[in-house]
């Protein structure tokens, strides 16, 4: 058994569109997915499939997206190619476009039959603007209290619900922010998390660091004061340890972009956190990578997920602008210890990014050099030495050239 799993991200609605083309028939529902597709993934060594975007979405987000120009990403983009953000969730029910809740259970069952496990999204920070809970339970959200200030704003809706935001960036205009200094919100989201785990083997938690108390108060201090909210005694993510008492095998993966915050989330119970800093170092060059690895201990690497691309990042070959550099970075991420995180079609060497709001990327041919590289790499990391990760870092202190395992 592998000590650290290999995760493979798939955006489900674009994948269904891709499968429809591959099999020359309409495949739009979970139950219509040819099961041999999962055999392919298992045979190359995948352990977990993160099926991104299964939850019910609102209409407002889609309408906003349809006003955007995607021609730079997809020159021949048509209205039907725009499908809306998978993170503008109205409620944790299966998106009826792809099936129902029973179909999610069917998916988990079929994956288990092939010794695969299923990861689904938990998006804790926000809901879609048109979530039914915005009407039934407005106290769940961060709201503007000055009713005379409800003018057109990039920060909140005309009804005073604040758009979700990262403290360093502009708000996302298709989603509204939950208030984690409200006890009812905390209980509501805990119940949502437990509900999701009935359908899967683990969750990928979107922007998990933003609801840490210290980050939340930094982002929303003024609004929280106006709402007379006090900082909670506990962190929301302490629920992970409670869940693991009953369900010890449930996996928790955090999207987070700073190593110091990753460590806090790991301490709260996350199995793995994004290792975006390693990707940034890989972009700079070997000296930065060597220094980064030198100052991190193996326990840290055992709790992070290494990747060179995902749905947020550009394709690796585009970023590195060189297939050999991209492959080298992929090799490091797959052999350093910790979760190995691959993106759908990464092995094909595509350059064109699949935007999360679209059902397809701009067409291109597979890069045979990349295909052959990943065929070899996936065979290598099936070896027991990489499954156990019972090894130590050996530093090349003299800086001499060393023989390459993969040329």
Locate each region found by the language model:
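Active-site and adjacent substrate-binding regions of carbohydrate-active enzymes
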Residues: 1-407
């Amino acid at each position: 058994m592998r000590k650290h799993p290999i995760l493979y991200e798939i955006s489900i609605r674009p994948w269904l569109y891709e499968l429809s083309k591959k099999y020359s028939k309409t495949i739009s529902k979970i139950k219509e997915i040819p099961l041999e597709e999962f055999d392919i993934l298992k045979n190359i060594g995948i352990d977990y499939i993160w099926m991104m975007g299964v939850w019910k979405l609102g209409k407002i987000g889609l309408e906003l997206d349809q006003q955007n120009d995607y021609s730079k990403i997809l020159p021949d983009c048509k209205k039907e190619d725009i499908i809306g953000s998978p993170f503008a969730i109205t409620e944790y029910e299966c998106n009826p476009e792809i099936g129902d809740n029973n179909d999610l259970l069917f998916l988990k069952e079929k994956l288990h039959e092939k010794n695969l496990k299923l990861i689904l999204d938990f998006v804790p920070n926000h809901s879609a603007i048109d979530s039914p809970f915005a009407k039934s339970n407005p106290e769940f959200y961060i709201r503007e209290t000055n009713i005379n200030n409800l003018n057109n704003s990039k920060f909140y809706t005309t009804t005073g619900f604040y758009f979700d935001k990262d403290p360093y960036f502009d708000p996302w205009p298709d989603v509204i922010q939950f208030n984690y200094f409200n006890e009812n919100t905390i209980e509501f989201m805990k119940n949502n998390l437990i509900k999701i785990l009935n359908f899967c083997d683990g969750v990928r938690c979107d922007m998990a660091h933003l609801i840490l108390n210290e980050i939340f108060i930094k982002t929303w201090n003024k609004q929280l004061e106006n709402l007379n909210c006090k900082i909670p005694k506990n962190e929301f993510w302490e629920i992970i340890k409670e869940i693991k008492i009953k369900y010890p095998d449930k996996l928790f993966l955090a999207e987070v972009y700073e190593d110091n915050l990753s460590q806090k989330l790991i301490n709260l119970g996350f199995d793995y956190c994004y290792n975006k800093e390693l990707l940034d170092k890989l972009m700079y060059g070997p000296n930065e990578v060597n220094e980064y690895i030198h100052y991190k201990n193996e326990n840290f690497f055992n709790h992070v997920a290494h990747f060179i691309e995902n749905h947020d990042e550009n394709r690796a070959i585009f970023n590195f602008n060189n297939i050999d550099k991209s492959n080298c970075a992929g090799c490091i991420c797959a052999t350093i210890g910790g979760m190995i995180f691959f993106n759908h079609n990464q092995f094909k060497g595509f350059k064109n990014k699949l935007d999360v709001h679209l059902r397809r990327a701009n067409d291109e041919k597979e890069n045979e050099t990349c295909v052959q590289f990943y065929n070899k790499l996936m065979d290598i990391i099936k070896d027991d030495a990489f499954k156990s990760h019972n090894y130590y870092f050996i530093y090349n202190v003299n800086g001499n050239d060393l023989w390459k395992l993969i040329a």
